[in-house]
Design a protein with these regions (language model features):
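Hydrophobic h-region of N-terminal signal peptides that target proteins for export
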Residues: 37-45
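Short acidic, flexible loop segments centered on an aromatic residue
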Residues: 74-95, 131
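Feature activates predominantly on carbohydrate-active enzymes
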Residues: 153-155, 204-400, 408, 417-422, ...
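Flexible, acidic glycine-rich loops studded with aromatic residues
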Residues: 478-496, 501-628
Length: 628
């Protein structure tokens, strides 16, 4: 409204006051209506919610669980996440498996819906159905409140004697433990040859340290050692070096994403343990976590999560992972990835990205289907649309395997490899290898074609890419098994390492020990119901990781690695809890391959150092960790 100069000042002020009054009246009226709506919703119980009740284990080993859905709209659908366990409905509408951990229930009538179903007994409380979301046509998806009712279970008795921390520590007792120390001013007897990473620290009467080393790794490890020694420093000489050239940590950011800052904190922990390789698991079924500029759908589609549409199609994003998060953006831009690379390299840590193939490839398959829909370009297609294979993967997917006989698969990964090489080169950081996964290709994939021929085609196709670019590959042990002799020999020339559980039957390949029963940090600490984690390979605590003895294995062992898979994680706090303190056992075995004294004595010393010198640091930094 335009006011001319003929209007008086009073009329202008009066009109402005009237407008303000009307505006405030509207706000108050709408606020009152909203509050009234909330009060009515609460009073009438119209907010859909969930009650889940744990059932007792029956003689046949199953448990009858109960799921009650309150105030459900007719014709709606409820989604939730849970590990697949062959549920059998007994009462109420059926529970339908979609893909992976995703389930849905179609609601036939409004009101309260009760379901009873047989499933497995609950081994730990973190395995409950979770992330319930109400889906209605034409409306936004709505997370639902969930209440859990658990049975009373007897508590597992804790054997605290197994974790004594009464060893009398010396000033140089740190983790990893130093190999040679002499207190006083007498020098150590010098070793004739210096391994990579070797250093010597001499501390005189005045407490000033003198550092000797042969390379940048040794200089950094000497710095880490000095930062851990308690003050004041007594006169002493320390001489130390790593037993294994490869000391790794695998971080899965696909199933529960870690922010850049969280990754940097994990790198700091790795550096304090003198680990030197971050195996970065950034592409799998559940997500593709690295920006590739030529294929924006990899992250615009493959790193976003939403419920499938009403026709069970993933049209704009991938289905949720086990954590149930929807609408999240879970990937690293090229610049963020390079920031991680530089931060790690400053701490003498190399980064090896993993793109899991040819199984575990659902995110890339679905994303490139979206790319083809947008562009009409089928030359990067990853899955044959005419393939009628029927299979069920270890993680309960039926559509996650590359059609390795398509040349377009290798054209796609050529672009990916080129981008990764460029990012490392521009960051000024070496690229030791690209990890191609190779594990858990389900039986039934590539139906109608010889499975062994398909593996030969895949390995040779990836080797073509690597050799043309002068890079090396890495993979899980599956990639070397069942190959023709000529393919094995070719692979040896381009292979940096394979991650193995057991070296039996694997000869002539560089091996990084990664046995699940000793190095999978996502396995629960114990059978305590309140612990998070899986248990398919037993339980893993700091005693178990420390008990790994690489000397018990045959073969060309170049190192050891801890694995932190994230299907059971829901936060950074969960991640640090599963890492601390049991990750230190693997770090110790990478630096010091074995233990010379009796196990209980060696572990008592090791755990005493953790309690006295590691845990106070974690407390100050606010990390969540396992306390006893």
């Amino acid at each position: 409204m335009d006011f001319s100069q003929n209007h008086t000042k009073n009329s202008v002020e009066s009109l402005q006051a009237t407008r303000i009054f009307l505006f405030l009246s509207q706000i108050m009226r709408k606020t009152s209506q909203f509050i009234l709506f909330l009060l009515l919703a609460v009073a009438c119980g119209r907010t859909p919610s969930v009650d889940w009740t744990e059932g007792a284990t029956e003689p046949d080993g199953r448990a009858l669980h109960t799921l009650v859905l309150h105030d459900m709209p007719k014709g709606s659908r409820v989604w939730f996440q849970e590990l697949f366990d062959g549920k059998t409905s007994v009462e109420g509408p059926s529970m339908n498996h979609y893909q992976g951990t995703s389930w849905y229930i179609d609601i036939p009538e409004s009101g309260t819906v009760t379901l009873k179903y047989y499933g497995r007994p609950l081994p730990r409380r973190s395995w409950v159905p979770e992330a319930f979301v109400l889906q209605q046509q034409g409306r936004a998806d709505t997370p639902m409140e969930v209440r859990y009712l658990f049975l009373e279970h007897p508590q597992t008795e804790k054997d605290e004697g197994c974790f004594a921390s009464n060893y009398e520590l010396q000033p140089a007792d740190i983790i990893p433990q130093v190999k040679r120390v002499n207190y006083g001013t007498e020098p150590l007897e010098l070793i004739e040859s210096h391994p990579t990473g070797w250093f010597r620290i001499t501390i005189g009467q005045g407490g000033e340290p003198k550092v000797e080393c042969d390379d940048e790794d040794g200089a950094f490890y000497a710095q880490v050692t000095l930062s851990k020694l308690p003050r004041p420093l007594p006169p002493m000489t320390i001489e130390d070096w790593p037993d294994y050239a490869y000391r790794g940590f695998m971080l899965d950011v696909v199933r529960d994403f870690r922010t850049v800052d969280e990754v940097l904190e994990i790198i700091d922990l790795m550096a304090s343990w003198k680990l030197n390789t971050l195996h970065f698991h950034i592409a799998d079924d559940e997500s593709w976590c690295l920006e590739i500029k030529d294929f924006p759908e990899l992250t615009e589609f493959g790193a976003h999560h939403a419920l499938p549409d009403w026709n069970l199609q993933e049209t704009c994003a991938l289905k949720p992972s086990a954590n149930g998060k929807i609408g999240n953006t879970s990937f690293y831009t090229a610049e963020e990835y390079q920031r991680i690379l530089r931060y790690a390299w400053d701490r003498r840590i190399r980064v090896i990205p993993e793109f899991d193939t040819p199984g575990h490839s659902r995110a890339s398959i679905k994303a490139m289907q979206a790319y083809e829909r947008r562009t009409g370009d089928s030359s990067f297609r990853l899955q044959d649309s005419t393939d009628t294979s029927r299979y069920w993967s270890a993680q309960d997917f039926t559509d996650n395997v590359l059609s390795v006989y398509l040349s377009s698969v290798y054209k796609f990964y050529g672009v990916v490899f080129d981008e990764v090489i460029r990012l490392h080169k521009e960051a000024g950081v070496p690229l030791p290898a690209i990890h191609i996964g190779g594990d858990e290709v389900p039986d039934g994939a590539w139906s109608g074609r010889d499975r062994h021929d398909m593996k030969e085609i895949f390995i040779n196709g990836m080797l073509d890419l690597a050799e043309a670019r002068g890079i090396r590959l890495a993979g899980w042990e599956d990639i070397v098994k069942g190959l023709k002799p000529e393919t094995q020999e070719r692979l040896k020339n381009s292979l940096y390492f394979i991650n193995v559980w057991n070296t039996e039957g694997i000869e002539g390949f560089p091996v990084v020990l990664s046995p699940a029963a000793y190095t999978y940090l996502d396995l629960a600490y114990s059978d305590d119901l309140n612990e998070i984690g899986l248990s398919w390979a037993g339980y893993v605590d700091e005693r178990k990781t420390f008990a790994l003895n690489p000397n018990d294995y045959k073969g060309d062992i170049i190192g050891v690695q801890a694995q932190l898979w994230s299907s059971q994680l829901r936060s950074f706090e969960d991640a640090t809890y599963q890492m601390l303190p049991k990750g230190l056992g693997v770090a110790e075995r990478g630096w010091n391959g074995g233990y010379l004294e009796p196990f209980e004595t060696a572990f008592n010393r090791f755990y005493s150092i953790i309690v006295a010198r590691e845990m106070p640091v974690w407390e100050r930094k606010g990390y969540v960790f396992k306390k006893r």
